[in-house]
Design a protein with these regions (language model features):
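Catalytic cysteine-centered active loop of the rhodanese-like fold, especially the PTP/DSP P-loop
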Residues: 59-82
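Post-Walker A helix-loop "phosphate-sensing" segment adjacent to the P-loop in P-loop NTPases
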Residues: 82-92
Length: 110
């Protein structure tokens, strides 16, 4: 999913040292509101795919987010998507923030 339509905190000097995991960027994105509307639409699409994958017995679905630098908007979006899928479906989620060299595992909820 292309996040470049969402207002970019990276164009402001004070947000450049941060990522979408840091509170200043999170606050910027959430106060602006564009990210919430964007993700609501993405959740709807992905939820339908996850349900269909589960019904069909598939075990791997890759969801990717991108933006200009891979630091703010896409990181925020990927983090929130991973949390959303894990809490809604209880499945294992492997999250990779490639540009930050961060990996996080959300184990399946039994």
């Amino acid at each position: 999913f292309d996040c470049r339509a969402v207002n970019n905190p990276g164009k402001y000097e004070r947000y450049k040292p941060f990522t979408g995991l840091d509170e200043p960027v999170i606050t910027f994105l959430e106060e602006d509101g564009e990210i919430t509307r964007f993700l609501d639409h993405v959740y709807e699409i992905v939820d339908a795919s996850v349900k269909r994958y589960m019904d069909r017995g598939f075990t791997n679905l890759m969801i990717c987010f991108g933006c200009t630098g891979g630091q703010h908007r896409s990181v925020y979006s990927a983090q929130h998507m991973a949390e959303h899928i894990h809490s809604k479906f209880g499945v294992r989620v492997d999250l990779v923030h490639r540009e930050q060299n961060i990996e996080q595992l959300f184990n399946a909820i039994l």
